[in-house]
Amino acid sequence: MDPEETSVYLDYYYATSPNSDIRETHSHVPYTSVFLPVFYTAVFLTGVLGNLVLMGALHFKPGSRRLIDIFIINLAASDFIFLVTLPLWVDKEASLGLWRTGSFLCKGSSYMISVNMHCSVLLLTCMSVDRYLAIVWPVVSRKFRRTDCAYVVCASIWFISCLLGLPTLLSRELTLIDDKPYCAEKKATPIKLIWSLVALIFTFFVPLLSIVTCYCCIARKLCAHYQQSGKHNKKLKKSIKIIFIVVAAFLVSWLPFNTFKFLAIVSGLRQEHYLPSAILQLGMEVSGPLAFANSCVNPFIYYIFDSYIRRAIVHCLCPCLKNYDFGSSTETSDSHLTKALSTFIHAEDFARRRKRSVSL
């Protein structure tokens, strides 16, 4: 195959330039062949174990399941599926970019990574919307926040993510360059670049805006609630801290990587390249591991900041501690907030009605 008809891309999903040469695009930053195999191996081991424990603890926990747990289990499953492909990329980085595991795994692993990216972002968006409805509109949202609705939403997300990953499955192929195998895509066309740009905007930046908007509204509602109820300081600070940690983890993991991807696609669409391809390549090389690491950090975030999940994991790993008191009630912080805000909203409505009747 002609080398100029293919190109290798560091983001594994989308072609980024219609004129790139595989020899230029494939040039590795020196640290990658040593650091990335070690880093990806650590991500693989901790992520597979963490997500398996998280899924098992929530699935086999006795009693009723929280609505948010359905989204968390699906997110952990998505991360687990992605993590299974990491040994293939460890081998790729260790062999200086050569793909030694065949055409089927070249296509399949790239497709699974693409599905994981879309599925994770959409699930995180739904989780933020669910949290927004539970805290900001606790009374009105009761008819929408049902278990059957959550299962339908998750099934729809998996279906949409599988469809969005099809372009990667169809375009990725094993290519021989100088008798060396590479997992590559055909040269990008302007139509594919436009599709990649639109897909990136609507599957990352729009969900990102939704997530940030939801959590800003939640923070505003919490501030109003605690100011009205007179409960400042510790509870307010803890609630706001958890919110910002969740948002910050998402931003640190995905924003740099997708920003460089966005710039690479835009640069490929323009006749004049304002950013050298070497800078874009370096940016994706450095930020890519952060995006990959997101799949292993979620279980630790939930364990540290969600007492319900922490109890479920400890009881799953150590059944002898089933009756151990963790110093908190069986209800979650969301449950407390939902009940408190429901009372707060009812009180506000009653005050408005009373004020209106007095004015009349």
From Swiss-Prot:
InterPro entries on file: CCR1-9-like, GPCR_Rhodpsn, GPCR_Rhodpsn_7TM
Reported modifications of this chain: Phosphorylation is necessary for YWHAE binding and efficient surface expression. O-glycosylated. Sialylated O-glycans in the N-terminal tail inhibits binding of GPR15LG.
Extracellular topology ranges: 1-33, 91-120, 171-192, 261-284
Membrane topology annotation: Multi-pass membrane protein
CDD domains according to UniProt: 7tmA_GPR15
Keywords assigned: Cell membrane, G-protein coupled receptor, Membrane, Phosphoprotein, Receptor, Transducer, Transmembrane, Transmembrane helix
Pfam families per UniProt: 7tm_1
A GO molecular-function annotation: G protein-coupled receptor activity
Domain of life: Eukaryota
Membrane topology, Cytoplasmic segments: 55-69, 142-149, 214-239, 306-360
Transmembrane helix in keyword set: yes
Gene3D superfamilies attached to this UniProt entry: Rhodopsin 7-helix transmembrane proteins
Family of this protein: Belongs to the G-protein coupled receptor 1 family.
PANTHER family for this protein: CELL ADHESION MOLECULE, G PROTEIN-COUPLED RECEPTOR 25
Full protein name: G-protein coupled receptor 15
Organism: Homo sapiens
Organism classification: Eukaryota, Metazoa, Chordata, Craniata, Vertebrata
Gene field: GPR15
